[in-house]
């Protein structure tokens, strides 16, 4: 399946189609959207965002705890879309504050 992902970035909103077997960060790069990242392995907070609408599968990640995931935090480098959704990006400072 392919889902519509909307990213709310500091420079505006961007929408793209993301297959359910491609990480959101990787697909964003494919379509020319620059997002922050560092480890690309779900073990840091550089790519952190917040899910506003929809759902993701980020079971490959290890940095976030269950409480943070429950609050909507997402690591875009290890997140697959499982529905159409909206994610606020560039949230590392807020997450680690």
UniProtKB/Swiss-Prot annotation:
Its main location: plastid. [2Fe-2S] cluster binds at residues 39, 44, 47, 77. It holds the Pfam family Fer2. Keywords: 2Fe-2S, Chloroplast, Electron transport, Iron, Iron-sulfur, Metal-binding, Plastid, Transport. Binds 1 [2Fe-2S] cluster. Ferredoxins are iron-sulfur proteins that transfer electrons in a wide variety of metabolic reactions. NCBIfam families: fdx_plant (TIGR02008). This is Ferredoxin.
